[in-house]
Amino acid sequence: MSASPTAGQAGLSYRDAGVDIEAGDALVDRIKPFAKRTMREGVMAGIGGFGALFELSKKYQEPVLVSGTDGVGTKLKLAFQLNRHDTVGQDLVAMSVNDILVQGAEPLFFLDYFACGKLDVETAATVIKGIAHGCELAGCALIGGETAEMPSMYPDGEYDLAGFAVGAVEKKKIIDGSTITPGDVVLGLASSGAHSNGYSLVRKIIDVARPNLDADFHGQRLQDAIMAPTRIYVKPLLSLIETLPVKGMAHITGGGLTENVPRVLADNVTAVIQRDAWTLPPLFQWLQAEGRVADAEMHRVFNCGIGMVVIVAKEDAERAIRHLQAAGEAVWQIGEIRERAEGQAQTVVV
């Protein structure tokens, strides 16, 4: 071991290097009640251990685990600019649980990673409270996470987020799009806004248009519309899956309708989406007008008001719509599946 400091010299500490261990401990104490509210059957230990334990329910006969990981992207830059951190946690959860839901998986647990240059306990607690709220909406447990304070890695007041979700589905009930055939119906579930995608373009439009973000925008502030948290579709869609055969689903994230729907389609079919089947929400009308964004670019970047696509047989479409509406979802029949012509795109918006 090296020599101790000489008389009159103060030894360096981790705090001198920019890491506040006490702040980290205080944060753990703050977030434990939030995590506790998310606990569900299967969780075997509370937050704070080296590893999180989860026992898979015996209700599964041939369980397949489904995992997903994601972040919030540059929507965080707006959170920093507006000093509002209460919704990005739900965004983080939604991006992963909606992804694994597409294959029919029930989200079981979630872990988060919060990284910053200097830990602000109040900000971090607000973010993680939002993560816990998202987990409650999804019915999964916030079973663990990591808070990394890394001096000089991030500017003061900024942080980054990553999330990881694990779910389970019966092997025979995996939804993979393999049963989709021409004549099937494409349903669209309403988004709550831009969700967590396209925000580099959103921020560019704001930079160019320089709007008053506190101005009234259809009954709310413009910033509220822009920062609305990503909708979590888990509970209504798990209920639908138990009610009727769902052939395919697509979470409309980066790439919009035209790049996400093809991910669940076989090569021999195409989805034809009718753009007049739903009304483009005011936020997207504003973004398109202020940014002079072409229709094709809108459909390739934004969800344009459709956060989740569900594909069912034609004879099940009306029943599916009624079921989802009863669960509180706004849903439209937005298109159909057709046989794909040679050279045709797998999803076209007409």
Curated annotation (Swiss-Prot):
Task: Tell me one Pfam family matched here.
Answer: AIRS_C
Keyword list (alphabetical) reads:
ATP-binding, Cytoplasm, Ligase, Nucleotide-binding, Purine biosynthesis
Question: GO molecular-function annotation terms?
Answer: ATP binding; phosphoribosylamine-glycine ligase activity; phosphoribosylformylglycinamidine cyclo-ligase activity
Can you say where in the cell this protein is located? Answer: Cytoplasm
- Its EC number is 6.3.3.1
Q: What class of enzyme is it?
A: ligase
Superkingdom, taxonomy of origin: Bacteria
Coarse class of the primary localization is cytoplasm
Entry GO CC = cytosol
> Which Gene3D superfamilies is this protein grouped with?
PurM-like C-terminal domain, PurM-like, N-terminal domain
**Reactions listed under catalytic activity:** 2-formamido-N(1)-(5-O-phospho-beta-D-ribosyl)acetamidine + ATP = 5-amino-1-(5-phospho-beta-D-ribosyl)imidazole + ADP + phosphate + H(+)
Q: In which pathway does it act?
A: Purine metabolism; IMP biosynthesis via de novo pathway; 5-amino-1-(5-phospho-D-ribosyl)imidazole from N(2)-formyl-N(1)-(5-phospho-D-ribosyl)glycinamide: step 2/2
Q: Does the keyword Amino-acid biosynthesis apply?
A: no
Query: A GO BP term, please?
Result: 'de novo' IMP biosynthetic process
The answer to whether keyword Glycoprotein applies is no
The cysteines covalently paired via disulfide bonds are none
Family membership noted in the UniProt record: Belongs to the AIR synthase family.
Q: Extract the PANTHER family matched here.
A: TRIFUNCTIONAL PURINE BIOSYNTHETIC PROTEIN ADENOSINE-3, TRIFUNCTIONAL PURINE BIOSYNTHETIC PROTEIN ADENOSINE-3-RELATED
Give the protein's recorded name: Phosphoribosylformylglycinamidine cyclo-ligase
